[in-house]
Amino acid sequence: AVYAETSVTLYGGADGGITVQKLKGKSATVKFANGSLDTNMFGITGTEDLGSGNSVFFRLEQGYVLSNGKEDDDSGDKAFNRQAYLGFTSRLGQVAFGRIGALGSYNGEYSISGSSAYNTSFSALSNIHSAFILTDWMNNTIAYLSPNLNGWKLHATYSNGVNEDSEKWSSFQVGRLLGDVG
C-alpha cells in the first residue's frame, strides 16, 4: 500500500484551440484543434521520504484527446499510455522501473533532450530522436539518472520490450544503450 505521508500530486494539462482557415473565393473552415501547443494529459506522482536522503517515488500519466476524452494513442491496451513507473532515489542517483520516455524522445525526466514531465523545455538536440530513438515511450525499462557530478549528469536506460514481445530487442539496442553526459 502507498501512504501519502510525504507528497502526492495530481497534475495535468488541457490544450485546445479554434483554427480558422479561409481560402480566396471559399467559405471559412472553423475547427477545434487538440493539443495545439502542448500535450493533453493528466497524472499522479508521489514521493515517500525514507530518511537519510533516500526516497521512493512513482508516476502514472495518461494522455487524452481533449475534444472527446479518448486516449491519445488509440491503443486501448494501457491504463497509463505515457508514463507508469516506480523508482528509488539515494545519494548515488535515481533508478526507475516501468514505462518511461526514451532517452532522445523529449518525453519524461530521463530524456537527454531536456524535457520535463510538463513538456516545458526545448533542446538543441532536435535530430537525436530520428537518428537513434525508434519510439517515444519504452516498456519494461530500467532508467538511471546520476546526481550532479561537478556539472555533469549521466542518463542511461535499458529496455527488453520496447513495444511488444514480437519485436526483436536487438533492433532497439542503440536507443536503449545510448547514454549522455551533460
Feature map (PLM): residue ranges:
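Outer membrane beta-barrel
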Residues: 5-20, 29-161, 166-168, 175-180
